[in-house]
């Protein structure tokens, strides 16, 4: 896992997004409702909603600013919570329970999603009311929680300036790893109190099932084997067999593979 930090950071997923006909003026053919973009694994899909809508601005039923709080993404009629990093969402719904690298024949080259709207908002999706600033605040709030788990207090995040917070966010949106990590490394301790981990049920469901244990820094395999019902987990698109990590500390895995919200996201049969 030597170069895994930047390899994961530079990873991206090809996405085709089909807009709900209710977002568009009448008579738009189905082919014109499609938008193709590439979304970084280490990002939130909601960051790209303004770009998706901008591509079809000329045929939108309303102004982009009016639509943003009313839309969300779905996959096979399952609403996707943007609050989970995009790479993790992809892994949950695309074969993590079988082992992502187990069969290239079944590998999805383009993830096909829908951008939908309805009168009733799904309970597992946070409405975007304050635009991109809401996403930035959400990410820093998540880091505040993780800082408490790691250090026993949130002081390291609380002491960050607004400019520091903006640099973290700009690092994510501008794909500048140096800018992002320059601030984040000030939050991480040499010796953690506990480790923030989010374990997701493989293959998802109407609502992603997630357990968030705060684990002590034992070996990686020892820390998670009592929670999962498989001999491997998936993290950042990597299939990790527990037997291979009996001598690797959980914090070492966390340090290399934690996501932009501060959590180490693992996907497994629960």
From Swiss-Prot:
MF terms (GO), sorted A to Z: Atg8-family ligase activity; cargo receptor ligand activity; enzyme activator activity
UniProt cross-link Glycyl lysine isopeptide (Lys-Gly) (interchain with G-Cter in ATG12), position: 144
Principal cellular location given in the protein's record: membrane
Record note on modification: Conjugated to ATG12; which is essential for autophagy.
UniProt keyword annotations, A-Z: Autophagy, Isopeptide bond, Membrane, Protein transport, Transport, Ubl conjugation
Presence of the UniProt keyword Protein transport in the record: yes
Parts forming coiled coils: none
Topological relation to the membrane, as annotated: Peripheral membrane protein
GO cellular component: Atg12-Atg5-Atg16 complex; autophagosome; cytosol; fungal biofilm matrix; mitochondria-associated endoplasmic reticulum membrane contact site; phagophore; phagophore assembly site membrane; vacuole-isolation membrane contact site
Gene Ontology biological process terms, A to Z: cellular response to nitrogen starvation; cellular response to potassium ion starvation; cytoplasm to vacuole targeting by the Cvt pathway; mitophagy; piecemeal microautophagy of the nucleus
Compartmental location: Preautophagosomal structure membrane
Cited Gene3D superfamilies: 3.10.20.620, Autophagy protein Apg5, helix rich domain, Phosphatidylinositol 3-kinase Catalytic Subunit, Chain A, domain 1
UniProt similarity note: Belongs to the ATG5 family.
The protein's role, per its UniProt record: Involved in cytoplasm to vacuole transport (Cvt) and autophagic vesicle formation. Autophagy is essential for maintenance of amino acid levels and protein synthesis under nitrogen starvation. Required for selective autophagic degradation of the nucleus (nucleophagy). Also required for mitophagy, which eliminates defective or superfluous mitochondria in order to fulfill cellular energy requirements and prevent excess ROS production.
Xref: PANTHER family: AUTOPHAGY PROTEIN 5
Protein name: Autophagy protein 5
Annotated organism of origin: Candida glabrata (strain ATCC 2001 / BCRC 20586 / JCM 3761 / NBRC 0622 / NRRL Y-65 / CBS 138)
């Amino acid at each position: 896992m030597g170069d895994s930090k930047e390899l994961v950071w530079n990873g991206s997923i090809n996405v085709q997004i089909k807009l709900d006909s209710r977002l568009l003026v009448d008579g738009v053919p189905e082919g014109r409702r499609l938008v193709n973009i590439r979304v970084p694994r280490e990002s939130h899909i909601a960051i790209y909603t303004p770009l998706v809508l901008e591509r079809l601005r000329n045929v939108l039923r309303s102004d982009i600013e009016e639509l943003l709080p009313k839309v969300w993404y779905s996959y096979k009629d399952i609403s996707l919570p943007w609050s989970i990093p995009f790479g993790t969402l992809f892994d949950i719904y695309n074969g993590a329970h079988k082992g992502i690298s187990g069969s290239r024949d079944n590998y999805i080259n383009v993830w096909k999603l829908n951008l939908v709207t309805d009168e009733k908002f799904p309970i597992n999706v946070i409405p975007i009311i304050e635009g991109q600033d809401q996403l930035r605040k959400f990410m820093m709030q998540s880091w505040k929680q993780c800082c408490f788990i790691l250090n026993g207090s949130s002081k390291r995040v609380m002491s960050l300036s607004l400019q520091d917070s903006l640099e973290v966010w700009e690092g994510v949106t501008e794909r500048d790893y140096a800018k992002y990590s320059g601030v984040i490394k000030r939050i991480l301790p040499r010796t953690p109190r506990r480790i923030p981990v989010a374990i997701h049920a493989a293959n998802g469901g109407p609502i992603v099932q997630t357990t968030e244990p705060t684990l002590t820094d034992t070996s990686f395999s020892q820390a998670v084997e009592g929670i999962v019902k498989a001999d491997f987990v998936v993290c950042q698109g990597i299939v990790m067999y527990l037997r291979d990590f009996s001598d690797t500390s959980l914090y070492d895995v966390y340090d290399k593979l934690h996501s932009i919200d501060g959590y180490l996201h693992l996907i497994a049969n629960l």
